[in-house]
C-alpha cells in the first residue's frame, strides 16, 4: 500500500495541470519495483509560477551584468590572449571574453530544477561563439555521463541542472585569471573580483528563493565542483566568503546551507575517482545514491567552509 507520502504525491500528480499519463506510470513503476525506496526525484514536475519568475529574473540579471562588463572592458580579450601566450597555451580562437550561458535559455517552465552546479570559469570550448554554454568540454561530458549511468538519481544533466560558474570571465585555464588581473591593472582586477562577488551573492539568492517554493523532499541542491581555489589565498576566496555570508543573513536562508555541497571537479575524472574512493572506505556493496553524495559533499564543505 501507499504510505501517506505516496498518497499525497499521487494526488499532486493527478491534480497537476501538467499531468501526463506516462509520468504517472513511471512513478508507479518506481514505487512498486524500486530496490530500496521511492526516488521522488524520478517524477518530472513543472516549476511553479513563482519559481519560474525567480529563475527568469536571475538569468535576465546575469545577462545584463555580462553585457555591462563586456561594454566596460573591451580590452579584456587582448589580456586573455596575452595570458594564454605566457602560459604557452596552444593557439585557439578567442571569441567571447565574458560568457553568458545560453543553456539557461533552453530551460522551460516545464522543467524541474534539481541541481545548481557551479564550475570555475568558462574555458576554451565554452567561450566559442557556437557554444556560449558552460561545461560543454570534456568535464561537461564526464558530468553528463555520470548522471546517465546513475539513472536512479533521476537527473538529466542538460534538463534538470542550472550550470553556472564562479565568474563568467573566460580563460583557457582557471589559473590564468591571476595573470589577466595582474596584467590588466587595478580596473581589471576589480572586475574579476566584482564578478566573483556578484555571482556568489546572486547564485545564493537564486538557490534560497527556489527552495522556499519547494517541498522538503524536492529541495534543489547546490554543488560547488572544484574547490582547490576556494581554499585560503585561493583565486576564488572572495566567492567563497560571499557565498557563505549570503546564506547566513537570516534563519530561513541559513536552513538552505545544508543543501550546499562541495565536490572535486568533473575534469580528469576527479569527481568520480573521489566518490569511488569514499565509497570503498565507507560502504561495501552500496549504490551511488543521494545519501552517499550528500555525505561526501558535506565532508568537503566542512573542509572548505569550516562547518
Which residue ranges define each predicted feature?
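Polybasic, lysine-rich low-complexity intrinsically disordered segments
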Residues: 9-12, 36
Amino acid at each position: 500500500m501507499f504510505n501517506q507520502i505516496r498518497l499525497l504525491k499521487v494526488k499532486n500528480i493527478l491534480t497537476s495541470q501538467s499531468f501526463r499519463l506516462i509520468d504517472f506510470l513511471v512513478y508507479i513503476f518506481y514505487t512498486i519495483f524500486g530496490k530500496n525506496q521511492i526516488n521522488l526525484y524520478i517524477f518530472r514536475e513543472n516549476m511553479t509560477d513563482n519559481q519560474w519568475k525567480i529563475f527568469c529574473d536571475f538569468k535576465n540579471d546575469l545577462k545584463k551584468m555580462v553585457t555591462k562588463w563586456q561594454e566596460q572592458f573591451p580590452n579584456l580579450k587582448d589580456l586573455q590572449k596575452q595570458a594564454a601566450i605566457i602560459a604557452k597555451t596552444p593557439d585557439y580562437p578567442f571569441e567571447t571574453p565574458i560568457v553568458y550561458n545560453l543553456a539557461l535559455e533552453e530551460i522551460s517552465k516545464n522543467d524541474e530544477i534539481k541541481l545548481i552546479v557551479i564550475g570555475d570559469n568558462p574555458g576554451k570550448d565554452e567561450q566559442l561563439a557556437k557554444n556560449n554554454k558552460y561545461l560543454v568540454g570534456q568535464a561537461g561530458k564526464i558530468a553528463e555521463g555520470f548522471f546517465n549511468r546513475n539513472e536512479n538519481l533521476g537527473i538529466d544533466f542538460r534538463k534538470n541542472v542550472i550550470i553556472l560558474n564562479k565568474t563568467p570571465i573566460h580563460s583557457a585555464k582557471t589559473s590564468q585569471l591571476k595573470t589577466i588581473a595582474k596584467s590588466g591593472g587595478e580596473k581589471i582586477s576589480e572586475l574579476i573580483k566584482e564578478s566573483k562577488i556578484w555571482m556568489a551573492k546572486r547564485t545564493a539568492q537564486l538557490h534560497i528563493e527556489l527552495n522556499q517554493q519547494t517541498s522538503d523532499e524536492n529541495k534543489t541542491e547546490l554543488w560547488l565542483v572544484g574547490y582547490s581555489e576556494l581554499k585560503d589565498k585561493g583565486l576564488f576566496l572572495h566567492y567563497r566568503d560571499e557565498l557563505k555570508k549570503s546564506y547566513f543573513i537570516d534563519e530561513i536562508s541559513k536552513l538552505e546551507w545544508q543543501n550546499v555541497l562541495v565536490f572535486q571537479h568533473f575534469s580528469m575524472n576527479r569527481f568520480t575517482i573521489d566518490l569511488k574512493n569514499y565509497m570503498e572506505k565507507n560502504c561495501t556493496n552500496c549504490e551511488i545514491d543521494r545519501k552517499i553524495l550528500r555525505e561526501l559533499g558535506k565532508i568537503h564543505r566542512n573542509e572548505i567552509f569550516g562547518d
